[in-house]
């Protein structure tokens, strides 16, 4: 199945889309990768959910990516007498280590490590930023605050700390169990929530040990101070605008989105733009004009993928939301301005063999107006370098490793195919041309560019670029 767009679509599964029939509909509507949010799925149900996707994959004969999203450390308040309290602007309010129910003067914060990390002037956001406190005084097991924005506060509401580096590990015990379950069930990508530093990603990568790629979710302002380091150590990046918009001024989020996207592209890492892209489609069959522009902007910026969260997980119109996102991406990619923007954002190749080969392939594509690049790959790294340049040609990844094909479903412009490795140079060229015809990326008389490594079967050995003509024999044997 050939998609007519290069930008990929990630669909979150949930109550509105967890049946085999609905997952299949989402796939045919345009979903390339399915996200499973471990904040809302019981661990024991994960293997079953993944197997449903694999069944659809086998029937469709096209790789489907699976992203398992770890919950990460969730900070929450304790309870209140009467289940709630109302805080007034300007009043004093205390967070402490006393587990008894709170009132209008104080409440339990069941995270002693957070109380010890707070400092005067630090902000505290409660219930997605609906209430805002400023720390005025800190002592052992106690933080005194001034209420800047008050309101009703109820049991176990979430707490965000935009100015505080959280002294908590990257993974909770729940995350560790979910990670092992995801790896055992065959997840292709693992998303790490609330990343603050490169070490958070390194910890997950150490456990994953190559069994899945690791994606860092940028949703804490602290991550921006070490953004390049985090992106370098990660296999992919998600711009998680929801929590970013809570912990930093909303008007700064678009600029941050552009910055993250550009750095990820420069470093050759897939970047996903997420959160509230088509939010109104949770309850409406059509999006707002602003939402259409939001999705289009992410595509124009060159994001590898755009993601739906509640729209596909819990909305009334999950299939329509995927279809809408699909049409927006297709329309943007037909715009000549899209390609001129991508061209203006290209960066110089890194001084590596893979980058040099990718740059040469890109120049040949432009000089000869070729439609497709056929890339033989084991690890997928050269394919990602090809996609990094955003060529005006489809990148067809030919790999003997099914896990590589699935991981590449996240990458811009890549059409992955699982096939046995080439036996020699002639077999490499013939089968590449044959697949180009079979997948409708080329016709008889077209030329295709082939990127490969000799000797075959050795990861990281990409060292050859070749041009092949598509003949009638290729078409007859496709």
Swiss-Prot record:
Homotetramer. This is Pyruvate kinase. Its EC number is 2.7.1.40. It comes from Methylorubrum extorquens (strain ATCC 14718 / DSM 1338 / JCM 2805 / NCIMB 9133 / AM1) (Methylobacterium extorquens). It catalyses: pyruvate + ATP = phosphoenolpyruvate + ADP + H(+). InterPro entries: Pyr_Knase, Pyrv/PenolPyrv_kinase-like_dom, Pyrv_kinase-like_dom_sf, Pyrv_Knase-like_insert_dom_sf, Pyrv_Knase_AS, Pyrv_Knase_brl, Pyrv_Knase_C, Pyrv_Knase_C_sf. Mg(2+) binds at residues 219, 243. K(+) binds at residues 37, 39, 69. PROSITE patterns: PYRUVATE_KINASE (PS00110). The keyword Transferase applies. Keywords: ATP-binding, Glycolysis, Kinase, Magnesium, Metal-binding, Nucleotide-binding, Potassium, Pyruvate, Transferase. Its cofactor is Mg(2+); K(+). GO terms for molecular function: ATP binding; kinase activity; magnesium ion binding; potassium ion binding; pyruvate kinase activity. Belongs to the pyruvate kinase family. Pathway: Carbohydrate degradation; glycolysis; pyruvate from D-glyceraldehyde 3-phosphate: step 5/5.
């Amino acid at each position: 199945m050939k998609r007519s767009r290069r930008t990929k679509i990630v669909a979150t599964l949930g109550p509105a889309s967890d049946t085999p029939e609905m997952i299949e509909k989402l796939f045919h509507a345009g979903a390339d990768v399915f996200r499973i949010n471990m904040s809302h799925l019981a661990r024991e149900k994960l293997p079953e959910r993944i197997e449903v996707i694999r069944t659809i994959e086998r029937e469709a004969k096209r790789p489907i990516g699976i992203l398992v999203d770890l919950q990460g450390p969730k900070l929450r308040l304790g309870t209140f007498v009467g289940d709630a309290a109302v805080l007034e602007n300007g009043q004093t309010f205390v967070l402490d280590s006393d587990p008894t129910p709170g009132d209008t003067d104080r409440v339990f914060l069941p995270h002693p490590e957070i109380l010890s990390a707070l400092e005067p002037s630090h902000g505290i956001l409660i219930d997605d930023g609906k209430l805002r406190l400023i720390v005025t005084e800190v002592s052992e097991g106690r933080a005194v605050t001034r209420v800047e924005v008050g309101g009703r506060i109820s049991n176990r509401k979430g707490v965000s700390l935009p100015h505080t580096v959280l002294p908590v590990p990257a993974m909770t015990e729940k995350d560790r169990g979910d990670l092992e379950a995801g790896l055992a069930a065959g997840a292709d990508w693992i998303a790490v929530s609330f990343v603050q530093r490169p070490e958070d990603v390194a910890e997950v990568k150490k456990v994953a040990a190559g069994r899945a790629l690791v994606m860092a979710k940028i949703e804490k302002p602290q991550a921006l101070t070490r953004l390049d380091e985090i992106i370098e150590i990660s296999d992919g990046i998600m711009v998680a605008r929801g929590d970013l918009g809570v912990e930093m001024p909303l008007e700064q989020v678009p600029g941050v989105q552009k910055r993250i996207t550009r750095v990820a592209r420069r470093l050759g890492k897939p970047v996903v733009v997420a959160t509230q892209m088509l939010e109104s489609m949770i309850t409406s069959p059509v999006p707002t004009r602003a939402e259409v522009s939001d999705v289009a902007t992410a595509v124009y910026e060159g994001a590898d993928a755009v993601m739906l969260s509640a729209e596909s997980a819990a909305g009334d119109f999950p299939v329509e939301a995927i279809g809408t996102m699909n049409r927006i991406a297709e329309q943007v990619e037909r715009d000549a301005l899209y390609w001129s923007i991508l061209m203006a954002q290209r960066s110089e190749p890194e001084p590596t063999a893979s980058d040099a080969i990718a740059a040469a392939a890109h120049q040949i594509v432009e000089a000869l107006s070729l439609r497709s690049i056929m890339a033989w790959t084991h690890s997928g790294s050269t394919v990602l370098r090809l996609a990094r340049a955003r060529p005006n040609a489809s990148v067809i990844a030919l790999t003997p490793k099914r896990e590589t094909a699935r991981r590449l479903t996240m990458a811009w412009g890549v059409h992955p195919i699982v096939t046995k490795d080439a036996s020699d140079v002639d077999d490499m060229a013939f089968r590449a041309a044959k697949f180009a015809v079979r997948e409708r990326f080329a016709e008889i008389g077209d030329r295709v560019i082939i990127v490969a490594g000799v000797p075959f079967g050795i990861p990281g050995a990409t060292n050859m670029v070749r041009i092949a003509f598509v003949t009638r024999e290729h078409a007859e044997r496709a």
